Amino acid sequence: MNKQITKELLEIGAVQINLDTYFTWTSGLKSPIYCDNRLTMSYPKVRKNIARAFILMLEQDGFKPDVIAGCATAGISHAAWLSDLLGLPMVYVRSKPKGHGKGNQIEGASVEGKTVLVIEDLISTGGSSIEAAKALQQAGANILAVYSIFTYGLDKSKDAFLQANIAYNSITGFDELIQELIGSGELSEEEKNELLTFRESL
């Protein structure tokens, strides 16, 4: 399933690599890899496979959540599809509380006393996912884990989740992407080394 989703993300252009002209991330960082999992919304087969992969991860981890929480904004749709398949309640978490109305950071029914799985589309440093999980904890939730579609596999993110004492897992990521591209002959050993050097620099 993971290998299939890696291939599908490449096929629809959700993950792209360009070693000649680097992409510019929101942070301003120049990168040879760009991930936009929002594209998966437009591909029913891909998004269904992603939801099924999340269910498989839950089964493998032995987790039984009461609630599925989506991280705003790209994690919301995947949390909705997953919660629908599981027949579970869903909430979503903003990066910060609203500046109007009730000033909610978490939208949906109360999560107090509930066991919650957090869904994120992408983990880079892990910062935004951890902040969402902490907001849920402050609201009285017990966090099972953060699940994402793709991870860059940075040491920085591993350390951050460890320090926050929050489990995390991802369907696919940087290492699986390289394996897929090497296997299909689309990436040379030299290009692979350039990508690995880039990741180590972060």
Swiss-Prot record:
Q: Which NCBIfam families match?
A: pyrE (TIGR00336)
Q: Which CDD domains match?
A: PRTases_typeI
Pathways involved: Pyrimidine metabolism; UMP biosynthesis via de novo pathway; UMP from orotate: step 1/2
Top EC class per UniProt?
A: transferase
Pfam families recorded? Pribosyltran
**Species assigned in the record:** Oceanobacillus iheyensis (strain DSM 14371 / CIP 107618 / JCM 11309 / KCTC 3954 / HTE831)
SUPFAM superfamilies, alphabetically?
Answer: PRTase-like
Family (UniProt): Belongs to the purine/pyrimidine phosphoribosyltransferase family. PyrE subfamily.
Per UniProt, what is one GO molecular function of this protein?
magnesium ion binding
- Tell me how this protein assembles: Homodimer.
Q: Which UniProt keywords apply?
A: Glycosyltransferase, Magnesium, Pyrimidine biosynthesis, Transferase
Catalyzed reaction equations: orotidine 5'-phosphate + diphosphate = orotate + 5-phospho-alpha-D-ribose 1-diphosphate
List the InterPro entries. Answer: OPRT (IPR023031), Or_phspho_trans_dom (IPR004467), PRibTrfase_dom (IPR000836), PRTase-like (IPR029057)
Known role: Catalyzes the transfer of a ribosyl phosphate group from 5-phosphoribose 1-diphosphate to orotate, leading to the formation of orotidine monophosphate (OMP).
Q: Name one GO biological process term.
A: 'de novo' UMP biosynthetic process
Q: Which cofactor does it need?
A: Mg(2+)
Positions binding 5-phospho-alpha-D-ribose 1-diphosphate in this chain are 94, 98, 100, 120-128
| Protein name from the UniProt record | Orotate phosphoribosyltransferase
Q: Identify the EC number(s).
A: 2.4.2.10
Instruction: Tell me the gene name.
Output: pyrE
For binding orotate, which residues are annotated in this chain's numbering?
124
Taxonomy of origin reads: Bacteria, Bacillati, Bacillota, Bacilli, Bacillales
